[in-house]
Design a protein with these regions (language model features):
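Immunoglobulin-like IPT/TIG beta-sandwich domains and homologous Ig-like subdomains
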Residues: 42-106
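Bacterial N-terminal signal peptides
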Residues: 6-15
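Beta-strand/beta-sandwich contexts
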Residues: 21-57, 111-124
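Conserved, mostly hydrophobic/aromatic
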Residues: 137, 182, 192, 213, ...
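Carbohydrate-interacting/catalytic domains
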Residues: 19-22, 107-109, 116-133, 180-186, ...
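Compositionally biased low-complexity segments at domain edges in trafficked proteins
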Residues: 125-149
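Active-site-proximal helices and loops of the catalytic beta/alpha 8
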Residues: 230, 248, 320-322, 326, ...
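Substrate-binding/active-site clefts of carbohydrate-active enzymes
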Residues: 142-327, 346-356, 361, 366, ...
Length: 641
């Protein structure tokens, strides 16, 4: 009932604003106030972006409706159609609808604004951690729960499922309808690629060219439906991570027709593309001109680079991030193209979010396979220049490259590189050992997001040559290595495109069974059992992944334990994860021959252990030299201590 009343209140405010109610004939008409609403008890100061033709001339602003809420300052923009208004929501402020009064001589414009009661539960809920498995989906390609919104009159690009780069119709309702599948797999967190408005004329399905930071794209649903999805996910023990983009927006964003400030976005004449040189942000010898091109050049022509050095822009970005957390109750952020941002303002953005929500986790995409270059961007890292990003978590691209290399099939016609090279095709399992040997570089291993693939990398099933045995080894590594595991949708069943090279539209494929009329339904046990052809291994691999990740939820040694690993021999690799309650042993036989576990070699840990349990079969395991492990197989044992 409380939510219904809140919804009714907000809708009435929007209706009032849209109709111009409270605004006298001939006066300026306010068309936009953001944030859409605010709350009592927030640490973050409130600064309103007010938009409307001629509103910049209304520099006398006050608040009607009660004590505790007042205007502190009014700032004019370069454009006469904007004002930025600092509003103090005092400790004694009460929830309700207040009236903003804008004056220009005798002309007066009024606008209703809602202050709600803060939900204190949001500050106490745990964000995503090493206890979780994050399931990554592309919402347009996951499931279509509401065909009526596949195309909408207020968006440019219409549904075109037959095109790999078109919109296919997946939406929030489709996610809600399949939360049981995600939970049953063992996933406890859901990361969706961006859901906010993207009105690009082509390729808008990916969502990385945001055209509205305060509204869900209508082809996915609505803000209210997103909040409902978060609530239903929480009911099933699933946390929700919102994918956001701070580096760039879209040429289709409403403000590109009339920017508040001339430097709201970086504009170069002639046009300048970013140089994509990731090392510049930490290079003590870098030329300032090169750094400027990296930070201020556009990612692509359709994605304007945001100027976070503009203090009004930075406040605007801080507030929409905090607004979405408080409004929806989401549990974490993933930040796209993290180190393309101006690094100091971006560190302030991260700190503002975590100051408002202590313990809130944010993971940044710092795409580089050199450990020292990604370690720089993690909060608390002792950097040479004293810089602290305040970014809690980073994505472990070096480890992803190592796993891919260790288990990959050579590309036809391409010569295999040297073995054991980190991130190279044709390497053996030693590539994983080598990647983990760099762990001394990282400030906090518990805040490393580990993964096999994602929406920007070739399908791992293609990389592995469509070999289910390699997929099982990879899933085992993902479940048992240090860090926070993330699984790309469909990798639990080895989705493949048939192309070992990256093809964005094809690798972000539709989940079979997510659309009415699909001939295959991999969401159900019956559908997986009946699948054939390219899906022939779906049931076998899904059951394997489910066993691992359901077990992982209670494996404390994987949540906060230490790692002890041994030098690989003959393409085999053994390591222990352990804490005060549990010991887990993983033996990877990546060779073409069956071997026995050389327990004596692992005596440093195994000599202390008695009878254990095979995690994958449930069978008892004794520590002796007669434990056979077939070729291309992972062996996992646990002991309670």
């Amino acid at each position: 009932m409380k939510r219904l009343l809140q919804l009714a209140l907000i809708l009435s405010v929007w209706a009032c604003a849209a109709s111009g109610q409270g605004q006298e004939a001939g006066d300026a008409v306010i068309t936009r106030v953001e944030p859409l609403s605010w709350w009592t008890g927030m640490k973050t100061p409130l600064q309103l972006l007010v938009g409307g033709e001629g509103i910049g001339e209304y520099d006398r602003v006050s608040v009607e409706g009660g004590c505790g809420v007042k205007v502190k300052a009014v700032h004019k923009a370069d454009s006469p159609n904007y004002l930025f208004v600092d509003v103090e929501v005092g400790k004694n402020a009460k929830p309700g609808t207040y009236t903003l009064v804008f004056g220009n001589g005798e002309a007066v414009v009024r606008y209703p604004y809602t202050i709600e009661r803060r939900n204190r539960d949001y500050t106490r809920r745990e964000s995503f951690t090493t206890k979780d498995l994050i399931y990554l989906i592309v919402p347009d390609r996951f499931a279509n729960g509401d065909p009526s919104n596949d195309s909408t009159p207020d968006t440019v690009e219409k549904a075109q499922r037959e095109s790999s780069m078109g919109r296919h119709g997946g939406d929030l309702q489709g996610i809600i309808d399949h939360l049981n599948y995600i939970a049953d797999l063992g996933a406890t967190a859901l990361w969706s690629t961006p859901l906010l408005g993207d009105d690009a004329p082509r390729g808008s399905y990916h969502g990385y060219a945001c055209s509205d930071y305060y509204h869900i794209d209508p082809r996915y649903g609505s803000n209210e439906l997103y909040r409902e999805m978060v609530e239903k996910a929480h009911e099933k023990g699933i946390k929700v991570i919102l994918d956001v983009v701070t580096n760039h927006s879209s040429t289709s964003h409403w403000w590109m027709k009339d920017m508040p400030f001339k430097d709201w976005v970086h504009v170069k004449d002639p046009y300048v593309n970013t140089n994509h040189t990731f090392s510049l942000g930490m290079d003590p010898n870098a030329a300032r001109s090169d750094i400027e091109i990296m930070e201020e050049g556009w990612f692509v022509r359709g994605m304007p680079d945001m100027n976070l050095d503009n203090p009004f822009m930075l406040k605007y970005f801080r507030q929409w991030a905090i607004w979405w957390i408080e409004y929806s109750g989401l549990d974490g952020f993933r930040v796209d193209t993290y180190f393309y941002n101006e690094k100091v303002p971006m560190s302030h953005w991260c700190k503002a979010v975590t100051d408002e929500y202590p313990g809130f986790n944010i993971v940044g995409e710092c795409w580089n396979t050199n450990p020292d270059m990604i370690a720089y961007w993690q909060a608390g890292n002792p950097n040479h220049d004293g810089f602290d990003s305040h970014l809690p978590s980073i994505m472990d691209f070096p480890l992803q490259g190592a796993i891919s290399a260790a288990l990959s099939a050579p590309i036809p016609g391409q010569e295999s590189p040297q073995p054991q090279g980190r991130g190279r095709r044709g390497a053996d399992i030693g590539a994983v050992y080598n990647a983990l040997s760099h762990d001394f570089i990282y400030h906090d291993l518990s805040h490393m997001l580990i993964f096999l693939s994602n929406h920007d990398i070739a399908r791992i099933g293609d990389t592995f040559g469509h070999k289910p045995e390699n997929m099982k080894i990879a899933l085992t590594l993902l479940a048992t290595l240090r860090g926070i595991p993330q699984l790309f949708y469909g990798d639990e069943m080895m989705f493949v495109t048939g192309n070992p090279r990256r093809d964005d539209g094809r690798l972000r494929m539709d989940f079979p069974g997510g659309w009415e009329g699909d001939s295959v339904n991999l969401f159900t046990p019956e559908g997986r059992a009946a699948a054939s052809g390219e899906w022939a291994h779906a049931e076998e691999l899904h059951d394997y992944a489910r066993t691992l990740f359901q077990w992982r939820k209670g494996a404390t040694a994987l949540h906060g334990g230490k790692t002890l690993h041994f030098l690989p021999e003959n393409n085999t690799y053994g390591y222990f994860r352990y804490d005060t309650k549990q010991v887990i042993f993983v033996f990877i036989n990546n060779s073409d021959n069956a071997v026995n576990v050389p327990w004596t070699r692992f005596g440093e840990m195994s000599d202390k252990l008695g009878e254990g349990r095979n995690v994958l079969t449930g069978e008892k395991v004794t520590v002796d030299d007669n434990t056979p492990v077939p070729c291309k197989t992972a062996f996992v044992v646990e002991w309670d201590i």
